[in-house]
Structures are given as structure tokens and as C-alpha cells.
Regions:
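Hydrophobic/aromatic-rich alpha-helical bundle segments in the mid-to-C-terminal region
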Residues: 68, 90-140, 146
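Amphipathic alpha-helical packing segments from all-alpha helical-bundle domains
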Residues: 42, 46-47, 51, 55-57, ...
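Hydrophobic alpha-helical connector segments
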Residues: 5, 10, 19-53, 100-107, ...
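Short amphipathic alpha-helical segment with a characteristic S/N-K-E followed by hydrophobic residues
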Residues: 1-4, 13, 66, 70
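A short secondary-structure junction motif
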Residues: 9-17, 47, 63, 81, ...
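Short glycine-enriched, charge-decorated loop/helix-capping segments at active-site entrances
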Residues: 20, 73, 123-126
Length: 149
């Protein structure tokens, strides 16, 4: 219905703002991964987006069909975009990534604390330097885990 259509529209805006396609040769994988998480964080902490996310959680509690649809079109979709970038990087020999979907799930875990804080209404520190350092550190560890042995 109407709520699903609103979710679809907002999802399209979200993906346009957050997850641009990874272009091998043009984009450095590290920078791409860092920028995607920073875009996600900036989008997530906007009050109107945080409120909408809370509304989605409330609505999906009453509708398993809506929950599945939102998950398939939202979190799973963005994980697949990252999995695709990881697959390209693997094919180019930049990393070793035999399970790109699992790796994409692990990657998004980097900002899980921020997501939970937003969902629970806990203020998120807006110190971008600290966030940048944290995300860079985590992406470094993530990529180290995908080096050829």
C-alpha cells in the first residue's frame, strides 16, 4: 500500500546517496569502503531518517510480509551492492574474498553501534574526526582479513 510505496521511494533516495557503484581503476577499494560507511552514517543520523527507520521497525513488527519485503529491498540490497564490489576486487586480485555476501554482512557490522544508538534515540557523537578514524581503522582490519595468504 501507501506505506510500502513511501518505503520504496525513500529506499531509492537512500541508495542514490549512499552506495555508488564501485568502478575498478577509478575507485580505490579502501576509499570506496570508507566513503560508503561515512555516507551511511551521515544519512542514518539525520533526524527524519532516524524517525523513519524507527517507524519501519514498528510497522514490520505487525507484518511479517512487510518485514521480509523491507529486508529484501533494503539491507539485503545494499549488502549485495557491497558484495558485488568485493567480487570485482577479488577478480582483479586486489583482495581474496571467497564469500562476498558474508563479507558484506561483516562490513556493515562496522557501523552497527551507530545504528543501534540511532534506533534507541541515543545521541550519536557528531565528531567526524573520531568517526573517520574509527571507520578507517575498521576498514583497514576488514581489508587485512581479505589479503591473500
Amino acid at each position: 500500500g501507501l506505506f510500502t510505496a513511501i518505503c520504496d521511494y525513500r529506499r531509492e533516495q537512500f541508495f542514490k546517496d549512499i552506495c555508488v557503484p564501485f568502478e575498478q581503476g577509478k575507485d580505490d577499494l579502501h576509499s570506496y569502503l570508507v566513503q560508503t560507511l561515512m555516507n551511511f552514517k551521515h544519512h542514518l543520523v539525520l533526524p527524519e531518517n532516524a524517525a523513519f527507520l524507527r517507524l519501519i521497525l514498528e510497522r514490520t513488527q505487525r507484518s511479517p510480509e512487510l518485514a521480509l519485503y523491507i529486508h529484501e529491498q533494503g539491507p539485503k540490497h545494499i549488502q549485495m551492492a557491497i558484495a558485488c564490489a568485493l567480487t570485482k576486487a577479488d577478480e582483479q586480485g586486489l583482495i581474496k574474498c571467497q564469500q562476498p555476501i558474508y563479507s558484506a554482512q561483516l562490513y556493515f557490522g562496522i557501523i552497527r553501534d551507530i545504528e543501534w544508538r540511532v534506533l534507541m534515540g541515543i545521541p550519536v557523537q557528531e565528531n567526524d574526526q573520531e568517526t573517520i578514524e574509527y571507520i578507517n581503522y575498521c576498514v583497514d582490519r576488514f581489508l587485512e582479513g581479505h589479503q591473500k595468504v
